[in-house]
């Protein structure tokens, strides 16, 4: 999670989300539709749908778009998407997990493989790197909702396993089976979280030099640019100097 979160910060600082807003909205809408189709179309009764709606709000997705994506799941013409996980390696041996939703497995596999190859990485078999990660629940809040000690105390009471707090916010992690209850307890105290989801958290984060870091960031960008890709999780971290460079 640390490596993934750090990279996400880079993405926001560079403004890439604004540059590809229609693509971002398309991916968010797809997850909303899939979540609504798999469960009930009521976010209050469907934890995955609620998480998808929260993610959409965090990206300032218009309310009409969100409602349209939910209604699409209720219609008979909604596409059927298959959820697939890909695993691979990047420059320097860094590990990546890619989550995708697709209506054409062959197309998506080809696109993801091409992105890995073009950026100096290699797609591996499922299970090749996932053992280096833990599947956990994540509940994220803005820093302003509480200080670090207050959040830690509340998270422990809610049944969470760990909390990371800094100026960018609070990230509470828990067993994946406990995500719903932990999120509900924390929301009752601090209000709506900015994100609730299941993530792949690296057991160990690998520090890479700036040259390798730039190559890895390019790889992740190329993978995330694929329409069918929903999430990319990594086990690397880049230097503060490279972060500052990318921020400029």
From Swiss-Prot:
Does the record bear Transcription regulation in its keywords? Answer: yes
Listed GO CC annotations = cytosol
Gene3D superfamilies with a match to the protein in the record = 1.10.10.200, 3.30.70.980
**GO BP of this protein:** regulation of DNA-templated transcription
Instruction: Assign the protein's first listed, main location to one coarse class.
Output: cytoplasm
Keyword list, A-Z: Cytoplasm, DNA-binding, Transcription, Transcription regulation
Instruction: Extract one GO molecular function annotation from the record.
Output: DNA binding
Localization, per the record, is: Cytoplasm
Keyword Thylakoid in annotation: no
| Family as reported in the entry's similarity comment | Belongs to the TACO1 family.
The protein's name in its UniProt record: Probable transcriptional regulatory protein Mnod_7401
Organism of origin: Methylobacterium nodulans (strain LMG 21967 / CNCM I-2342 / ORS 2060)
Lineage runs:
Bacteria, Pseudomonadati, Pseudomonadota, Alphaproteobacteria, Hyphomicrobiales
């Amino acid at each position: 999670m640390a490596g993934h979160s750090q990279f996400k910060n880079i993405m926001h600082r560079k403004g890439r989300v604004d540059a590809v807003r229609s693509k971002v909205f398309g991916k968010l809408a797809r997850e909303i539709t899939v979540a609504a189709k798999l469960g009930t179309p009521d976010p209050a009764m469907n934890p995955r749908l609620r998480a998808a709606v929260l993610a959409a709000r965090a990206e300032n997705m218009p309310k009409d778009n969100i409602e349209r994506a939910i209604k699409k799941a209720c219609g008979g013409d909604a596409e059927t998407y298959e959820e697939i996980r890909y695993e691979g390696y990047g420059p320097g041996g860094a590990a990546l997990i890619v989550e995708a939703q697709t209506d054409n497995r062959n197309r998506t596999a080809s696109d993801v493989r091409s992105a890995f190859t073009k950026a100096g990485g290699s797609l591996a078999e499922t299970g090749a790197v996932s053992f280096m990660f833990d599947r956990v629940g994540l509940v994220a809040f803005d820093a302003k909702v509480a200080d670090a000690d207050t959040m830690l105390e509340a998270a422990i009471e809610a049944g969470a396993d760990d909390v990371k707090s800094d100026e960018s916010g609070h990230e509470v992690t828990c067993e994946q089976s406990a995500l719903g209850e932990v999120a509900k307890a924390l929301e009752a105290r601090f209000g709506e979280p900015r994100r609730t989801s299941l993530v792949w958290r690296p057991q160990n984060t690998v520090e890479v030099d700036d040259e390798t870091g730039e190559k890895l960031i390019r790889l992740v960008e190329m993978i995330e640019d694929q329409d069918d890709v929903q999430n990319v999780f990594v086990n690397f971290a880049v230097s503060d100097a490279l972060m500052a460079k990318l921020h400029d």
